Amino acid sequence: MELVVGASEATMKSLLGKLGNLLAQEYALISGIRGDIQYINDELASMQAFLRDLSNVPEGHSHGHRMKDWMKQIRDIAYDVEDCIDDFAHRLPQDSISDAKWSFLLTKIYELWTWWPRRVIASNIAQLKVRAQQIADRRSRYGVNNPEHLDSSSSARTRAVNYEIAEYQVTSPQIIGIKEPVGMKTVMEELEVWLTNPQAENGQAVLSIVGFGGVGKTTIATALYRKVSEKFQCRASVAVSQNYDQGKVLNSILSQVSNQEQGSSTTISEKKNLTSGAKSMLKTALSLLRGNCICQPENDGNPDNTPIRLQETTDDDQNPRKLEQLLAEKSYILLIDDIWSAETWESIRSILPKNNKGGRIIVTTRFQAVGSTCSPLETDRLHTVDFLTDDESQNLFNTSICESKIRKDSNKVDEQVPEEIWKICGGLPLAIVSMAGLVACNPRKACCDWSKLCKSLFPEQETPLTLDGVTRILDCCYNDLPADLKTCLLYLSIFPKGWKISRKRLSRRWIAEGFANEKQGLTQERVAEAYFNQLTRRNLVRPMEHGSNGKVKTFQVHDMVLEYIMSKSIEENFITVVGGHWQMTAPSNKVRRLSMQSSGSNRGSSTKGLNLAQVRSLTVFGNLNHVPFHSFNYGIIQVLDLEDWKGLKERHMTEICQMLLLKYLSIRRTEISKIPSKIQKLEYLETLDIRETYVRDLPKSIVQLKRIISILGGNKNTRKGLRLPQEKSKKPIKNPSPQGKTKEPAKKGFLSQEKGKGAMKALRVLSGIEIVEESSEVAAGLHQLTGLRKLAIYKLNITKGGDTFKQLQSSIEYLGSCGLQTLAINDENSEFINSLGDMPAPPRYLVALELSGKLEKLPKWITSITTLNKLTISVTVLRTETLEILHILPSLFSLTFAFSLSAAKQDQDIIKDILENNKLDSDGEIVIPAEGFKSLKLLRFFAPLVPKLSFLDKNAMPALEIIEMRFKDFEGLFGIEILENLREVHLKVSDGAEAITKFLVNDLKVNTEKPKVFVDGIVTA
């Protein structure tokens, strides 16, 4: 079937649940409309069954415009009914009366109080019933046949099956390594030599990489960029695409180069101020921490990994001159991905400075003519990417299947999988990995079924593969998805091309949209994670970064996959994109989910002509000048994602507080400094993301949000925390003690029962808060958050023995017994984290622990936490003895030793003494124990000085895959060649490194064949 039914069926499924709940609320229904609601419920249930049957109809059966129009009517009435039900839930609140013991009098009072809104809703429901009747009649009147009348005996196409949610969930923590392009070893070596050829240093040279969409151009260009970037003084990468925006491209390049310039200025300052060695070292340490230590911020969007704020503060008219000044006397390399026209290249070239320092530009394009325009000179180079050979295709197919399988021991491909599957892909990597994901997720499918599938997809056996052929393959993979996963996949079309999408951000949005609900005993969060794992296994999304817990941190959607799902979303009116990288036709019907993206010279992303009155979800990307808040119906919007939008003003927050059904609100990295007290009106709010804003205090009314699940605040990079509300009783307590003395005013927890019954009981994540000496009420209030699963304190500055100290210790101990899974504390004076070991009851459910500060010793109970997966502790406890204690932890996936911000504030001599004493305690070197660390895959060290580390036994950390180090001084890494599973070592050298450090780094890189050693930073001695 060509029709899109996934999102419609999922919408219907959610709606039927709401109708069922409404029918159960007898007291809220007006006499006479129960029958109408029951009729609508039954009719929509039949429509849902029709849609489900429709999704299983074999390919080749199409009803043309009649079926599409009828499905559009089903979709529209489903959306309108859902709006009506949501309005019903809001206008007839139940929380305040659900516990009341209803009497006849109370019932009459309630009916009188809600008479008018119930009448309005009754009228709307009656109209919807009439529409449902008309839609049902229209289907038979115009000959829209039932799916069972069609030939459904064919098994040629893959069908969506009812996967168990448990199957989605089975996954193990992983680390993303750096993968080389398949079949490109020789070519990569040649291109790498060309890019670094000293004979061409007299001027700018351009490498154009041309090829069919999905053939791997960006993969090759990115691999080259990564390999050679350390040999250039400046570097930047940017995505362009069809809707080219010169200002955006220029700002992105400028911000990346400016950031590098600011980093290099530290070295110049050091050379000019040799007498101020202590300050210099401290300054460098702080710089290292703010950029790259345990407080490394997530990148949830910007595809070029560039600071957003700098882009907003630059003057467009001055930017070309600024870029020319920055690059005038420097060698540079630029990666410009996905150029669509010669005009776009000419525009880009006009803003790039020319010098005689050997500038290199790598461009990718689908079009040979564009590639020739970009590389017209003899000093330039044009490389066309060919399709893979049969051997390369089979190797990629087999490798992808093994990576997509659930079980760890699934390291070979079943012999029953016919070779036709990878042969129909025509050597196109995107098609090959997509089909591999399909095969891996259908292990019970017989060989004959796969052969029939291949013949049905390509009965004409066409070669080479065309764009239509790629679409057929993607259709096949899409149609195999269950309805829930189809909806989740289509939702990704909200994000711009090339965007690095945060998995957590996406999961929270899925939950707010109602796409991931509790199922088979799993929470919404676990279901969302399971859905994402399934999309990853099917190779429909590409993980880009893994967090230190082994879960995907950020991912991307391949350009061709994004184009495909965007076309499906438009067909079903599921997502509407304004602006963006591609030219899209505006929908003629109502907009439900709006994605506004800056593009071209039009930063307003005009919504003229669109019906925005029924927008339920609004997302803003880029530097938009205007968002038409006045056009929205505040009573409908449930998801509002304004992350990084610098146009957000304080007055907008007042309007946002009128969006009474809002479930998800993100104003992360905006200029907002205050949250209005009226936020308490958002009684359905589940996620509040105010990270990296100027908001320092939450209003007292925040405790009225009974459904809030996640509060995300503060700035992990700068360790600025969010202050929770607190208050004191004004009247002193008279004669409370036998001595007859008057005590100080009694302190209440900020979540005291007087704030409202059940305040914030749903809260699961509280991240980025600040607790200081005056925060005893906050410390006491944490005790009441018994559902808390994550607590992150970005700033802790309290005195040992004080009231706040005792309250916090008591709260953490209690929360640990209630199921706390993640605990992160940045202790500025280190007294609290050093006292944690004395807790009588350890937090036995911990999965992740982060202790930042001048930690003196490990907590005594740490070896009893068998569930611990991620551990981040201060480098001040880096000793051989520490590793000998930790090596017995059975589930530990990542171990990080970091140089904490609090330690960096100490005198240089104290810092040096701590590190030197650690070495002496370990006999001059840190030796990794020969046994233990059975599950450890990631080992990291972030410090100004990394002492000598030695692996003396091949059984030391047997599962270790990646070592990361960031430092200014380095004393060597020995024995890594004997570690069988170690794949990569990443070294980041801070500015101002000594000659001996550069020598050791170069020696390690040059003389180590396995594992691969990657260096970030200029290390030529």
From Swiss-Prot:
Role noted for this protein: Disease resistance (R) protein. Resistance proteins guard the plant against pathogens that contain an appropriate avirulence protein via an indirect interaction with this avirulence protein. That triggers a defense system including the hypersensitive response, which restricts the pathogen growth. Contribution of Pikm-1 is required to recognize the effector avirulence protein AVR-Pik.
Region of interest (Disordered), ranges: 297-317, 719-751
Induction context: By M.oryzae pathogen infection.
Residues spanning the membrane: none
GO molecular function, one term: ADP binding
Name of the protein this chain belongs to: Disease resistance protein Pikm2-TS
LRR repeats: 612-634, 659-682, 683-705, 785-807, 817-841, 843-865, 866-888, 912-935, 957-981
Cytoplasm is among the record's keywords: no
Pfam families in UniProt: LRR_14, NB-ARC, Rx_N, WH_DRP
Record-linked InterPro entries: Apaf_helical, Disease_R_plants, LRR_dom_sf, LRR_R13L4/SHOC2-like, NB-ARC, P-loop_NTPase, RX-like_CC, Rx_N
Region (Structured coiled coil (CC) domain): 1-182
GO biological process: defense response; response to other organism
Domain of life from the UniProt record: Eukaryota
UniProt keyword terms in alphabetical order: ATP-binding, Coiled coil, Leucine-rich repeat, Nucleotide-binding, Plant defense, Repeat
Tissue and organ distribution: Constitutively expressed.
Ranges where the NB-ARC domain occurs: 186-519
CDD domains, per the entry: RX-CC_like
SS bond partners: none
Family: Belongs to the disease resistance NB-LRR family.
